[in-house]
């Protein structure tokens, strides 16, 4: 480790101990050296004994900085790793940090634009940031060419070395988890960290975020439910993104929404519809839909529209995952637990040799109590959570796309019920899911598939006679090759039979000669002739095998 890494590790250890996080070390024989070492560091006592463990963990991560804050946010969605009281505290982590110098941001913008002054491209550039987070911060300006209001997102300077240094330490900690926890290997800590690192590195590439925003805007063009600001891609680079400035009410500001007369029921239902449309219609969903990234337009409060920003994290599901997920939801709400178990096996989410009866019973045991509540109070996110946690006991592999989906669904549900506590997610989502499944099977799906593939077959039609001729010729050649191989195999079997016969004769002659040589030494030449004959016969048999 470098001196810098050692200093950083010391700071992390001191922070963890000052918040009493040594409580997380399990009391096992293998951890005894760690617990002894902890006692030796007596000058680092727990200074927050009045707080619960979950709160102390959250405060420690906030003190350690942006990389650890985002790591905690990601862990809050993995409720199979932590008890609810810790996961709930991690979900409260806020990605808010002090802004860096506006002059430095201006310099970065100029570097991204080819060392040309900001004033060449933009008017009214505000040196004071509009918002600041751990990865980037945002400044306002106007496009010089048309005067449109824009925001410029700039990556923090020198953030990459900080991320790489902290990720090294997180990887070191992850390697210890399987050794320290009895269930550590099943939790796949290295996969969790790799997933987090990929998400973090993706957020550093604003060209990727620009492309995501453009795609999402195209998917919801002229939609009454969601507006995505325009991206000015000519000005975008890996470290800078320029997009239309929007004005709206933060979705978490319930008072402001009510004061302008917003139809809260419709707004909450549209949030659910937007989510399911992204997942099932588009196979492309905004996976960071926390309240800080969602606004509501000031226009037409009786017919409200969402505004979505910050498309750094997106998810997608393939066709099979979408179908299995939709059928899982419907089977669950129909209490068809056998179907749920079979779908998990058919999808490959659990191994094919899983005992379906045992799996069905486990799902029933965990999920049946949920129906003690009214349907309007049942959480889709927690349904998924319960299903996946049960499936993990049957060796379900971690599915990163489903983890993202679960996190996003929990956000959507939380926002929806904050807007309209009586929101019935199942009533809102069921027609959409049933319509989507109906569209994926039967005659409509067959017709659509034919239409999609018709241009390909029309293009290949002239080649079909030649392909048929080639197929017949190859079939004939293949038959000749098979006949030749069959003859060779038969010949080999005959030779092997002859070889075994000759080996037997040769061995018999050699053994007879040896016995005569021992018992009748007066028969001078006979043993020698027998042994020589046996050797010759044995050699002939050996050559037959060549």
UniProtKB/Swiss-Prot annotation:
Domain Protein kinase, first and last residues per copy: 124-502
InterPro entries for the chain: ABC1_dom, Kinase-like_dom_sf, UbiB, UbiB_bact, UbiB_kinase
Keyword Transmembrane annotated: yes
Compartments reported by the entry: Cell inner membrane
GO MF entry, a single one: ATP binding
Chain ranges passing through the membrane: 501-521, 522-542
Keywords: ATP-binding, Cell inner membrane, Cell membrane, Kinase, Membrane, Nucleotide-binding, Transferase, Transmembrane, Transmembrane helix, Ubiquinone biosynthesis
First-listed, main subcellular location of the protein, grouped into a coarse class: membrane
Gene Ontology CC: plasma membrane
Binding site for ATP: 130-138, 153
GO biological process: regulation of ubiquinone biosynthetic process; ubiquinone biosynthetic process
Membrane topology designation: Multi-pass membrane protein
Positions of the catalytic residues: 288
UniProt pathway annotation: Cofactor biosynthesis; ubiquinone biosynthesis [regulation]
Superkingdom of origin organism: Bacteria
This enzyme's EC code(s): 2.7.-.-
Family: Belongs to the ABC1 family. UbiB subfamily.
Function: Is probably a protein kinase regulator of UbiI activity which is involved in aerobic coenzyme Q (ubiquinone) biosynthesis.
The protein, known as: Probable protein kinase UbiB
Organism the protein comes from: Enterobacter sp. (strain 638)
């Amino acid at each position: 480790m470098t001196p810098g890494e050692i200093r950083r590790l010391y700071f992390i250890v001191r922070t963890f101990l000052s918040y009493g996080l040594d409580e997380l070390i399990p009391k096992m024989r293998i951890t005894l050296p760690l617990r002894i070492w902890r006692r030796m560091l007596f000058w680092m006592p727990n200074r927050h004994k009045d707080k619960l463990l979950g709160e102390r963990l959250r405060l420690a991560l906030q003190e350690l900085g942006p990389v650890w804050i985002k790591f905690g946010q990601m862990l809050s969605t993995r409720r199979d790793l932590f008890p609810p009281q810790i996961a709930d505290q991690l979900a409260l982590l806020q990605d808010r940090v002090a802004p860096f110098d506006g002059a430095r941001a201006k310099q970065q913008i100029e570097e991204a634009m080819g060392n040309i002054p900001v004033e060449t491209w933009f008017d009214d550039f505000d040196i004071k940031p509009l918002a600041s987070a751990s990865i980037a911060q945002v400044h306002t300006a106007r496009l010089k060419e048309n005067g449109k209001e824009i925001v410029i997102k700039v990556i923090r300077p020198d953030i990459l070395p900080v991320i790489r240094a902290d990720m090294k330490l997180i990887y070191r900690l992850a390697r210890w988890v399987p050794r320290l926890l009895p269930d550590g290997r099943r939790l796949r800590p290295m996969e969790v960290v790799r997933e987090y690192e990929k998400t973090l590195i993706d957020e550093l590439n604003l060209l990727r975020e620009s492309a995501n925003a453009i795609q999402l805007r195209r998917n919801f063009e002229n939609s009454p439910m969601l507006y995505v600001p325009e991206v000015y891609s000519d000005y975008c680079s890996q470290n800078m993104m320029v997009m239309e400035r929007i004005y709206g009410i933060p979705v978490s500001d319930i008072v402001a929404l009510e004061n302008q007369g917003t139809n809260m029921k419709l707004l909450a239902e549209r949030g659910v519809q937007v989510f399911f449309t992204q997942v099932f219609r588009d196979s492309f969903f905004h996976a960071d839909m926390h309240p800080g990234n969602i606004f509501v337009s000031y226009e037409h409060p009786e017919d409200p529209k969402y505004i979505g920003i910050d498309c750094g994290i997106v998810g997608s599901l393939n066709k099979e995952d979408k179908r299995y997920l939709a059928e899982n939801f419907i089977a669950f709400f129909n209490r068809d637990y056998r179907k749920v178990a079979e779908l998990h096996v058919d999808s490959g989410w659990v191994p094919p040799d899983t005992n379906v009866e045992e799996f069905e019973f486990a799902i029933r045991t965990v999920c049946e109590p949920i129906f003690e509540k009214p349907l309007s109070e049942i959480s889709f996110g927690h349904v998924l959570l319960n299903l996946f946690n049960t499936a993990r006991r049957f060796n379900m592999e971690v599915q990163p796309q489903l983890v993202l989906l679960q996190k996003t669904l929990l956000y959507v549900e939380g926002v929806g019920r904050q807007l309209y506590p009586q929101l019935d997610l199942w009533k809102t989502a069921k027609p959409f899911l049933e319509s989507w499944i109906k569209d994926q099977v039967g005659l409509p799906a067959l017709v659509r598939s034919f239409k999609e593939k018709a241009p390909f077959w029309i293009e290949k039609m002239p080649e079909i006679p030649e392909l048929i001729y080639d197929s017949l010729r190859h079939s004939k050649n293949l038959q000749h090759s098979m006949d030749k191989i069959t003859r060779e195999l038969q010949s080999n079997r005959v030779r092997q039979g002859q070889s075994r016969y000759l080996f037997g004769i040769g061995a018999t002659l050699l053994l007879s000669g040896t016995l005569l040589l021992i018992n009748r030494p007066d028969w001078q030449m006979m043993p020698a002739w027998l042994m020589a004959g046996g050797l010759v016969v044995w050699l002939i048999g050996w050559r037959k095998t060549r």
